[in-house]
A protein has these predicted regions:
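Short amphipathic alpha-helical "recognition" segments used for binding
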Residues: 8-9, 167
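Bacterial N-terminal signal peptides that target proteins for export
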Residues: 1-8
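Hydrophobic small-molecule pocket/channel-lining residues, especially in calycin-type beta-barrels
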Residues: 2, 20-215
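N-terminal signal peptide c-region/cleavage motif recognized by signal peptidases
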Residues: 16-18
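Short, linear, compositionally biased motifs with a strong N-terminal bias
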Residues: 12-13
Length: 215
């Protein structure tokens, strides 16, 4: 009987510590990004010849947001609007005020189905590395950019994005790596920061083409 109690106690400690190891990101967070909206210094961006050609051919009209299309991934990883994070058993939802984006990060071990087509938001799966959430997003559309300054994104089958989300007190931190060998010699790295807003709100967002820059 005594040994059974020890085993039971050990089991509770083991699984209890595993559960609490997962970070608590639920709630509304307001943007508090570093300079340049968390984008790297231009000198740190190493483009391939193909990427440089795309960059030099960029005009502001190619920004998807000017066509009232949501920025998606990787362009929408960092923006000045609040986000809300909701935990569910099989997924984590990231709700963006910007363009009312709803992002599903599946955490139940599933992989992208064969029929999944490239899209602005792609297909995101997540796993816990201690209290850090690691998100991998694939199936991304070429109708996107890495950043509004003209940094390109190929949308190739081999292109993907890895994010690491962690919490430090009331601060939520993101490091994102854009893996796009067509355009970049090494991953393009962005950093985002948000502050917990227990009384925060997600407001309605509306994109009106004539005000967005569409002629």
């Amino acid at each position: 009987m005594f040994s059974k109690k020890i085993v039971l106690a050990f089991t509770l400690i083991l699984f209890g510590s595993s559960a609490t190891a997962q970070g608590d990101f639920e709630g509304i967070w307001t943007a508090n990004h570093p300079p340049r909206m968390g984008q790297p210094d231009p000198s740190a961006v190493k483009m391939t010849p193909a990427g440089l050609a795309e960059f030099e051919a960029f005009t502001p009209e190619k920004d998807t947001q000017l066509r009232c299309l949501m920025p998606g991934i990787p362009l929408g990883l960092i923006d000045p609007y609040p986000i809300e994070i909701v935990y569910q058993e099989h997924q984590i939802l990231i709700l963006y005020e910007h363009f009312h984006q709803v992002r599903r990060v599946f955490i139940d071990g599933r992989t992208a189905p064969d029929h999944w087509q490239p899209s602005l938001g792609g297909y995101s799966t997540g796993e816990w590395d201690g209290d850090t959430l690691v998100i991998t997003t694939t199936h991304l559309s070429p109708d996107n950019n890495t950043w509004t300054a003209g940094y390109p994104f190929s949308g190739d089958e081999s292109a993907y994005v890895v994010e690491r989300w962690s919490r430090d007190g009331d601060e939520l931190n993101l490091t994102g790596e854009v893996h796009d060998a067509t355009n970049y010699e090494k991953p393009y790295v962005v950093n985002g920061h948000w502050t917990f807003a227990p009384d925060g709100e997600i407001w309605e967002y509306e994109c009106i083409p004539e005000y967005a820059g569409v002629k």
